[in-house]
């Protein structure tokens, strides 16, 4: 379950599909069964709830649908569970600046853990007030600063004849994935909105300025008629974009790695849209 799934279900009530609401509630209730006493969620598990990977680095991915579930169903159990995730995130990730293992295939520091942590506490700040709101906002800012350390502020050179060089890709504004998976990708989802919100919340224009750099840079490889960027379908965005000599076993620097499925870009509503 992800924010994209929960977000898409936000319109279901108006569309008169109560069966989908019940399915969604069932998934959220299953989430509650998976949560550990310390507030974390396992990274991988079987459908019988047997834990395959108990690493808590993916915990913020659970916060988002729990908050959305609370906003939609008004069930305080989901909000309570979301708050408990934030306690874990603050203690184990944010306070230690140790954002680890959010990507499914890396056991190391990675961008997504900090990116999703910032988004998770952002969601909580949107549905709280006063001291609690301020606390979550502060956590969001700390996590966002760390996430931004993964983003390029220069353009990696490509050799003549490499596809990305021929396309004219500028890496400024793109984020590296992890220490283990040393490539850039388009995985950002709501992070630019988080940065814009932080800019207003703290009167800090650097956040919104860099959100603009990210947003415009991400559009470089979006395929459309007359600008297909080596992709066969309009609207499909390649996920693994190889800007280093890191050996992924396919194509090499300056090309896409077609062993990985492309991401299809779309938008998700936030709690304030509910």
Question: Language-model segments: which ranges?
Answer:
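Single conserved hydrophobic/aromatic residue that forms the stacking wall/gate
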Residues: 1-7, 12, 266-274
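Residues within HEAT/ARM-like alpha-solenoid scaffolds
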Residues: 15, 19-22, 57, 73, ...
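Alpha-solenoid helical-repeat scaffolds
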Residues: 4-8, 13-17, 26-30
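Long, well-ordered core segments of solenoidal/helical folds
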Residues: 19-42, 76-100, 138-158, 209-228
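Core register positions within helices of long alpha-helical scaffolds
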Residues: 65, 69-72, 85, 120, ...
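Exposed, low-structure sequence patches enriched in small/polar residues
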Residues: 142, 188-196, 200, 204-252
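Active-site neighborhood of glycoside hydrolase catalytic domains
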Residues: 116, 120-123, 127-137, 141-146, ...
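Carbohydrate-binding/catalytic loop surfaces
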Residues: 4-8, 40-61, 98-122, 157-184, ...
């Amino acid at each position: 379950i992800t924010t994209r799934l929960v977000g898409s279900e936000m319109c279901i009530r108006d569309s008169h599909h109560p069966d989908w609401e019940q399915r969604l509630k069932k998934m959220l209730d299953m989430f509650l069964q998976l949560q550990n006493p310390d507030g974390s969620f396992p990274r991988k598990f079987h459908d019988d709830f047997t834990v395959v990977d108990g690493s808590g680095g993916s915990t913020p991915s659970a916060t988002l649908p729990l908050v959305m579930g609370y906003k939609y169903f008004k069930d305080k159990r989901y909000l309570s569970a979301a708050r408990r995730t934030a306690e874990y995130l603050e203690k184990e990730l944010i306070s230690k600046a140790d954002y680890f293992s959010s990507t499914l295939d890396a056991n190391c520091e990675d961008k997504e853990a900090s990116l999703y942590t910032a988004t998770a506490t952002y969601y909580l700040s949107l549905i709280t007030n006063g001291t609690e709101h301020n606390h979550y906002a502060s956590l969001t800012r700390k996590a966002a600063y760390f996430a931004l350390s993964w983003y390029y502020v220069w353009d990696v050179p490509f050799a003549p004849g490499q596809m990305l060089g021929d396309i004219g890709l500028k890496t400024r504004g793109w984020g590296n994935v992890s220490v283990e998976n040393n490539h850039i990708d388009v995985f950002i989802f709501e992070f630019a909105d988080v940065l814009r919100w932080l800019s207003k919340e703290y009167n800090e224009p650097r956040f919104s300025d860099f959100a603009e750099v990210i947003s415009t840079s991400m559009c470089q490889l979006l395929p459309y008629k007359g600008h297909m960027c080596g992709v066969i379908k309009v609207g499909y965005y390649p996920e693994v974009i190889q800007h280093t000599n890191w050996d992924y076993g396919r194509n090499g620097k300056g090309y896409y790695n077609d062993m990985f499925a492309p991401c299809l870009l779309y938008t998700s509503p936030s709690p304030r849209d509910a």
